[in-house]
Swiss-Prot record:
Protein name: Elongation factor G
Residue stretches making up the tr-type G domain: 8-282
Biological process according to GO: ribosome disassembly
Signal peptide segment: none
Coiled coil: none
GO CC term (a single one): cytoplasm
S-S bridge residues: none
Gene coding for it: fusA
Protein task: Catalyzes the GTP-dependent ribosomal translocation step during translation elongation. During this step, the ribosome changes from the pre-translocational (PRE) to the post-translocational (POST) state as the newly formed A-site-bound peptidyl-tRNA and P-site-bound deacylated tRNA move to the P and E sites, respectively. Catalyzes the coordinated movement of the two tRNA molecules, the mRNA and conformational changes in the ribosome.
């Protein structure tokens, strides 16, 4: 059986936004109009079709990116719903990696919000073309022009409306399409009856001005359009559409649309814009990977059904009915169920038992997938997030995703022996699904420690253990993941020599330690000349340093951002061994700790707080009391926004404190930004606590 939709008629899109901008409702309406859902489910009633994990329905927020397939005007649209909460940035990152385009949903009253900025930045990093949907036009305080201005002011985006709303709040009744200069009026509550009418006289002038502005914004990226403007020639609808599509695909322009998903207005026109302006897999640059056996040799995965099969696994989930589901995006070639593939990242052969086309929480079994498709495979045992799957003859590894290390930890203790075994299984599965979630057993205390990107992240993990895996656990207080580093340089010697009858142990190294740039990690340089340390022992020196750095030099936290240059040493023909050089390296690090001025680093969070003006003084005082540094303030509508950097250790329980300081009218978001040195007094406390004093 051949493909149902050509590559040209395929769209892989994500829907991204700040929490509560109406993203899930928007996706829901898309599924309703494309005939995938017969009853509309409201997020605030906890019944949305995309939010299919229990936690998501309880909290009314989207956590996992469910992939859904829909059809519109003879096109296949694969939609990935991405979470808007900062603790789940990993979900956003991994979905952006496999998309060709995205719809950014804004709240018509708030415009660009803090999390919109974060997601927008991530999308820019991955070069994802976007259209913008200004949602909630029916809301009190909705202001389309203000929302568009925030795209310019806060994101410096070359964005211009391709639609204008007629009315706002309760009066929002129709939408003017500036490309075709037609007006669409909604006559019923479900938004299925749309009438094309003339643009009202009192809007005509404004619409013409907005169309001029649109043409100028697009012409900046298009020479032939610019020439037509200079020659004062008429620009046809098709020419304008083509120019908008080209500029959008090149990520040089962002068309802005309007509507209200909740009141069913503007969603079909937004679907039309997805088809008209967002790229098909053929329009985006082919993805470049490298050969598995030679990282320097580039290989291109071309969007072509006849090419060798290559796909990227971007999400792993445990499904109660079919077990492990691996979501993947096909970049080239085709795959049939029952066939074998190679996981080139891990060098393993895997069998694809079944292929499922996902629709939020129902599924349809299909026999084949083609280039450009997004589907889920059942039966892959060893494949994890970011792994490349390819044909058995192919040898490509696609660029994987990088995930941040956890910044917050807490201990979990099973309540009974039965819970113990279930918890071990649950933690293995949850780590498979979420690369930013880590679990390990503390060697000294025997406690299980879990780590993640924020309090909400770990709350939801514990919640899932209880609901999905029936694990009852006691949870400890959150702990901050501190780090250590050196502030000054020193050259030191590490010598290990042991003679106790028979064969001895001997290793001797001279290493120069210097501070590395923030975030650059550990760098090891071998500067040995003349074989004073034989080549076979060099990796042991590096490994010995890495192992010792894991346990730190001050308070047991990992040592980061340090350069180590091995420049001298000596060895013994008989007594030297890999182990002896490992120990010598760790002794050198101990010696360096005395001379290199080690310090403790703490995670600093970028915090954005929004509240009514009258609470400004209290909030600023509170930020300062938490050792925070205010980075700027700006008015947003009738509220004030404070941007600050605050240590994570001072942010526990902040939600409660903010609620009481603002009578429940303040909101905040925070995400990890960088590591910074801890003040001396606090550093001493941390060291004492860790030494059990």
């Amino acid at each position: 059986m051949g493909r149902d939709f050509s590559l040209k008629n395929t769209r892989n899109i994500g829907i991204m936004a700040h929490i509560d901008a109406g993203k899930t409702t928007t996706t829901e309406r898309i599924l309703y109009y494309t005939g995938r859902i017969h009853k509309i489910g409201e997020t605030h009633e906890g019944a949305s079709q995309m939010d299919w994990m229990e936690q998501e329905q309880d909290r009314g927020i989207t956590i996992t990116s469910a992939a859904t397939t829909a059809e519109w005007k003879n096109h296949r649209v694969n939609i990935i719903d991405t979470p808007g909460h900062v603790d789940f940035t990993v979900e956003v990152e991994r979905s952006l990696r496999v998309l060709d385009g995205a719809v950014t949903v804004l709240d018509a009253q708030s415009g660009v919000e803090p999390q919109t900025e974060t997601v927008w930045r991530q999308a820019t990093t991955y070069g994802v073309p976007r259209i913008v949907f200004v949602n909630k036009m029916d809301k009190i305080g909705a202001n389309f022009d203000y929302a568009v201005s925030t795209l310019h002011d806060r994101l410096q985006a070359n964005a211009a409306p391709i639609q204008l709303p007629i009315g706002a709040e309760d009066e929002f009744s129709a939408i003017i399409d500036l490309v075709t200069m037609k007006c669409f009026k909604y006559n019923n509550d479900l938004g299925t009856e749309i009438e094309e009418v003339e643009i009202p006289e009192d809007y005509r002038e404004r619409a013409e001005e907005a169309r001029e502005a649109l043409i100028e914004a697009v012409a900046e990226t298009n020479e032939s359009l610019m020439e037509k403007i200079f020659d004062e020639q008429e620009i046809t609808v098709d020419e304008l559409k083509d120019a908008i599509r080209q500029a959008t695909t090149d990520v040089e322009f962002y068309p802005v649309l309007c509507g209200t998903a909740f009141k069913n207005k503007g969603v079909q026109l937004m679907l039309d814009a997805v088809i008209d302006y967002l790229p098909s897999p053929l329009d985006v640059k082919p993805i470049v990977g490298h050969r598995a056996d030679n990282p320097d040799e580039e290989v291109i995965a071309k969007a072509d059904d006849d090419a060798e099969f290559a796909a990227l696994a971007f999400k792993v989930m445990t499904d109660p009915y079919v077990g492990k589901l691996t979501f993947f995006r096909v970049y080239s070639g085709t795959l049939t169920s029952g066939s074998y593939v190679k996981n080139s990242t891990k060098g393993k052969r895997e069998r694809v038992g079944r292929i499922l086309q996902m629709h939020a929480n129902s599924r349809e079994e299909i026999s084949s997938v083609y280039s450009g498709d997004i589907a889920a495979a059942v039966g892959l045992k060893d494949t994890g997030t970011g792994d490349t799957l390819c044909g058995e003859k192919n040898d490509i590894i696609l660029e994987s995703m990088e995930f941040p290390e956890p910044v917050i930890h807490l201990s979990v203790e099973p309540k009974s022996k039965a819970d113990q075994d279930k918890m071990t299984q649950a933690l293995v599965k949850l780590q498979e699904e979420d690369p930013t979630f880590k679990a390990h057993t503390d060697e000294e205390t025997g406690q299980v420690i879990i780590g993640g990107m924020g309090e909400l992240h770990l709350d939801i993990i514990v919640d899932r253990m209880k609901k999905e895996f029936n694990v009852e656990a006691n949870v400890g207080a959150p702990m901050v993941s501190y780090r250590e580093t050196f502030k000054t340089s020193a050259a030191v010697q590490g010598k290990f020599s042991r003679q106790s009858g028979g064969r001895g142990q001997y290793g001797d190294v001279h290493i120069e330690f210097t501070p590395n740039e923030t975030g650059a990690g550990f760098e090891f340089e071998n500067a040995i000349v003349g074989g004073v340390v034989p080549r076979e022992y060099i990796p042991s020196v590096e490994q010995g340093l890495k192992d010792a750095m894991e346990n730190g030099v001050l308070a047991g936290y990992p040592l980061i951002d340090v350069k180590a240059k091995l420049f001298d040493g000596s060895y013994h023909d008989v007594d030297s061994s890999e182990m002896a050089f490992k120990i010598a390296a760790s002794l050198a690090l101990k010696e360096a700790a005395k001379k290199c001025d080690p310090v403790i680093l703490e995670p600093m969070m970028k915090v954005t707080i929004e509240m009514p003006e009258e609470y400004m003084g209290d909030i600023m005082g509170d930020v300062t009391a938490r050792r925070g540094r205010v980075d700027g303030m700006e008015p947003r509508g009738n509220a004030q926004v404070v941007n600050a950097y605050v240590p994570l250790s001072e942010m526990f329980g902040y939600a409660t404190s903010l609620r009481s300081n603002t009578q429940g009218r303040g909101t905040y978001t925070m995400y990890f930004d960088h590591y910074a040195e801890v003040p001396k007094s606090i550093s001493e406390e941390i060291i004492k606590k860790n030494k059990g004093e």
